[in-house]
């Protein structure tokens, strides 16, 4: 939400890398405890939003975005871990693996799967950075048939 409202480079980078990879993994291995419609709508919306921001050229990723987003994710997970410990919950499966089969099933027992998940996350961030290479400045683009590119051009000119 912050990325959409502010177009802050940091928020867009975090939404793209952490949101896309986290929601993507969740969609591939859904948790049986959540209502299916809400689960798929929420996680799908994260991916669609991140895709629209980055691939629609509404916002660009900066050099070093992978590392900034990864460091932000580690800090966020540390805060979530403290919250989990204090309130005896298991948000983001930091305290124990989900009951259903997921990628975490193959990464070893707790707490070792957390390290494996961190490595997999960094690899996913790197893979997500591949299709988002250097961008052409908006004022150098020719008029486009794609509305998102025209919107980006209008926003850049203001």
Q: Each predicted region: which residue ranges?
A:
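Cytoplasmic-side transmembrane-helix entry/capping segments in multi-pass membrane proteins
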Residues: 12-20, 39-41
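Alpha-helical transmembrane segments in multipass membrane proteins, preferentially the mid-helix core
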Residues: 45-63
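Membrane-interface helix caps and helix-loop-helix hairpins in membrane proteins
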Residues: 6-10, 29-38
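Membrane-interface loop-to-helix entry segments
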Residues: 36-48, 115, 119
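Aromatic-anchored segments of alpha-helical transmembrane domains
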Residues: 19-29, 73-83
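Membrane-interface capping segments at transmembrane-helix boundaries
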Residues: 59-61, 127-145
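Membrane-interface transmembrane-helix boundary segments in multi-pass integral membrane proteins
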Residues: 66-75, 87-125
